[in-house]
């Protein structure tokens, strides 16, 4: 939060700032108890389709409940944006803000990707990550971030 000092401190400011910490999203509540099962199921999957997406392009595909899909960069260093929608209700879509609130700025194995209000449910679960070796670099950067929105051509036109 930016502190601009425009407003006056309330008389009870000390009491307000000394309140006990409230954990909004307890770690034990977000634990994925199904991860072991999902990892076993991954061993049984068969490739049913392959889609190659050229750089600076996009493709849509449908993944049914219970199916797996893999995103793989096999040529160069690419940045890929992922948008998830409920195929039966396009109003329900990936909500990076809630996912970030629950799992932090970067997601990986076991983390769920949540949908928007009023649905707020898991649209996908990450079951494998070939880039988990990367961790965080010296600049604090990592992979699979949910810091902002996906590509938006209007971002660069803001004044």
Predicted regions and their residues:
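Acidic, Ser/Thr/Pro
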Residues: 1-159
